[in-house]
Amino acid sequence: MGLRRWLRSACCCCPCRCLEEPARPEKEPLVSGNNPYSSFGATLERDDEKNLWSMPHDVSHTEADDDRILYNLIVIRNQQTKDSEEWQRLNYDIYTLRQIRREVRNRWRRILEDLGFQREADSLLSVTKLSTMSDSKNTRKAREMLLKLAEETSIFPASWELSERYLLVVDRLIALDAAEDFFKIASQMYPKKPGVPCLVDGQRKLHCLPFPSP
């Protein structure tokens, strides 16, 4: 089940405690000393060719659905004869998906910078397998906000499966009391436009790939 459907099923209005997840011990405190952002993304890779947005074979970054999709495409491509028709097709799909992922991340960064997080934007967006929710009590709110962003703005391409990493990013915004402001700016910068093809900024010639969750 894709993350979008999972979020829908989780964001019910029942009064039970089924959605409350047990608190897990933090491997890295989210707030440390006088700098509330210093520990966000403690394993942040600043080299674009090594981070989770372009190189999925880093073992820290193959657990999320979209990382596995990209990783599997690369594995299949590498099994083909280089420069063959199938190899070129897969290579183009890999390039397209990477560009889409980079553009989505850039959209989030632009909004964070507009909120005043110029120095903290990259670390706020950094997610690895060591990342955890800051507070299990925020889980429901983070799910609802992520769905709201997906359904009421165009910050994500319409046919793009929601990424688990952005649930953690939204959780961080909630911890900083910046989630609602983030949504307001996202609505202004990337308003929902019915009928507009799901092409990302700067990639008007690239086709949108309906990558399903594995």
Swiss-Prot record:
Record keyword Nucleotide-binding present: no
Tissue specificity of this protein: Detected in melanocytes. Expressed in retina, in retinal pigment epithelium (at protein level). Widely expressed with higher expression in skin, heart, liver, testis and thymus. Detected in retina, in retinal pigment epithelium cells.
Effect of C18S: Loss of location at the melanosome membrane
GO biological-process terms attached to the record: developmental pigmentation; melanocyte differentiation; melanosome localization; melanosome transport; minus-end-directed organelle transport along microtubule; phagosome maturation; pigmentation
Stated consequence of mutating D177K: Mildly reduced ability to promote lysosome clustering at the center of the cell
UniProt feature coiled coil, ranges: none
Membrane-topology annotation of the record: Peripheral membrane protein; Lipid-anchor
A single MF term (Gene Ontology): phosphatidylinositol binding
Phosphoserine PTM positions: S213
Record note on disruption phenotype: Dilute mice carry a hypomorphic allele of Myo5a, resulting in melanosome clustering in the center of the cell. This causes decreased light absorption and an apparent dilution of coat color. The hair color of mice that are deficient for both Myo5a and Mreg appears nearly normal, but the abnormal clustering of the melanosomes persists. Likewise, mice deficient for Rab27a or Mreg have a gray coat, while mice deficient for Mreg and Rab27a, or Mreg and Mlph, have a hair coat that appears nearly black.
Keyword terms, alphabetized: Cell membrane, Cytoplasmic vesicle, Lipid-binding, Lipoprotein, Lysosome, Membrane, Palmitate, Phosphoprotein, Transport
Known function: Probably functions as a cargo-recognition protein that couples cytoplasmic vesicles to the transport machinery. Plays a role in hair pigmentation, a process that involves shedding of melanosome-containing vesicles from melanocytes, followed by phagocytosis of the melanosome-containing vesicles by keratinocytes. Functions on melanosomes as receptor for RILP and the complex formed by RILP and DCTN1, and thereby contributes to retrograde melanosome transport from the cell periphery to the center.
Subunit-level organization: Identified in a complex with RILP and DCTN1; interacts directly with RILP, but does not interact directly with DCTN1. Interacts with PRPH2.
Protein name: Melanoregulin
Gene source species: Mus musculus (Mouse)
Protein's gene: Mreg
